[in-house]
């Protein structure tokens, strides 16, 4: 149900009439993953089915020359949500943003969101990035109201007294150690 507003709107969007072209979460491929790092950091990723909607897409050729084919493919064709525990999120998906969560009091948290982009980005790509940001992440966008409701619900749930711990084991049956099919592996710092 999270991001229902976005998914529902996407199914009715008419790009021919000049609507903001967006990453299509409804048809994301089944290829996705979650990485857990030391000290509580983590990253979610998914492979896109429509990477041409991203502002970075027309830079694929240049990126292949600069960073190699595999890394360029990851930059252009995958989304990433990186959580730097405990309070910073670096997100590269529907657009690019940094979210900072700052506790104000025991029952209040400030969420600040910053859109970011490459310094050398063309005016056309910058405009596309900003429209996608406004479309999904802006306060009036399709995703942020749902996210803020999730934050509010979590905050309310943390006030519960009956349960000592928050169960975060969803998907635990699929956890694996070492590299996955993409060849990515976490580093323990011991190597």
Regions found by a protein language model. Give the residues of each.
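C-terminal catalytic domain of Rieske-type non-heme iron oxygenases
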Residues: 1-191
């Amino acid at each position: 149900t999270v991001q229902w507003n976005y998914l529902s709107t996407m199914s009715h969007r008419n790009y021919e009439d000049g609507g903001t072209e967006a990453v299509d979460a409804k048809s994301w491929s089944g290829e996705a993953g979650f990485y857990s790092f030391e000290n509580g950091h983590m990253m979610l990723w998914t492979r896109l089915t429509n990477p041409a909607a991203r502002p970075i897409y027309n830079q694929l050729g240049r990126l292949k020359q600069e960073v190699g084919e595999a890394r360029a493919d990851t930059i252009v064709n995958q989304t990433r949500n990186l959580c730097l525990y405990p309070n910073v999120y670096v997100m590269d998906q529907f657009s690019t943003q940094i979210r900072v969560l700052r506790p104000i009091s025991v029952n209040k948290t400030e969420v600040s969101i910053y859109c970011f982009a490459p310094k050398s980005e063309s005016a056309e790509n910058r405009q596309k990035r900003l429209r996608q940001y406004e479309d999904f992440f802006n306060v009036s966008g399709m995703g942020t109201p749902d996210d803020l409701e999730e934050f509010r619900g979590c905050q309310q749930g943390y006030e519960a007294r009956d349960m000592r711990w928050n169960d975060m084991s969803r998907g635990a049956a699929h956890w694996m150690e070492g590299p996955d099919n993409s060849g990515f592996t976490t580093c323990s710092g011991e190597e």
